């Protein structure tokens, strides 16, 4: 089925099964299968989407698995992080806090940051990427 057909099918499937934010989750799933950004959907509407992969991901969402675990990745502070079961899911609130920390750290001559045993490492890696004056331990 095409990306456009897969998206339509996914929205209907998720809505019928009571999954919240079915439009957004369907878009994320179908674009993830083709390894494209959500914003590139229109450019790939007629590309082929494997049915089995789509079905597997939709059933996981239906069963209540978080979208981030189903996708296996999530964006945080302009970078993509791999997310699996047992790893804390990066939240928008955390991203906002990290951006404030980055702004503060940039005002310092040097700084040491520890991001230990927190999951994906998205906090420490985001700080390391944007703050050359920080020594970050993961």
PLM regions with names:
Residues 1-50, 54:
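A short N-terminal interaction module
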Residues 7, 26-27, 54, 64-67, ...:
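A general structural signal for well-ordered alpha-helical segments in protein cores
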Residues 18, 72, 80, 127-134:
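Ubiquitous "structural anchor" signal
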Residues 31-103:
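Conserved AdoMet
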Residues 93-138:
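Conserved SAM/SAH cofactor-binding pocket of Class I
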């Amino acid at each position: 089925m095409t990306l456009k057909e897969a998206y339509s099918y996914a929205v209907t499937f998720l809505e019928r099964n009571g999954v919240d934010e079915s439009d957004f989750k369907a878009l994320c799933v179908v674009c993830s299968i083709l390894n494209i950004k959500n914003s590139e959907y229109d450019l790939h509407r007629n590309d082929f989407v494997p049915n089995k992969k789509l079905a597997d991901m939709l059933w996981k969402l239906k069963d209540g698995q978080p979208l981030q675990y189903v996708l296996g990745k999530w964006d945080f502070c302009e970078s993509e992080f791999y997310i699996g079961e047992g790893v804390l899911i990066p939240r928008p609130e955390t991203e906002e806090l990290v951006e404030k920390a980055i702004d503060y750290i940039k005002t310092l001559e040097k700084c040491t940051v520890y991001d230990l045993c927190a999951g994906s490492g998205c906090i420490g890696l985001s700080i390391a990427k944007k703050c050359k004056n920080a020594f970050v331990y993961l």
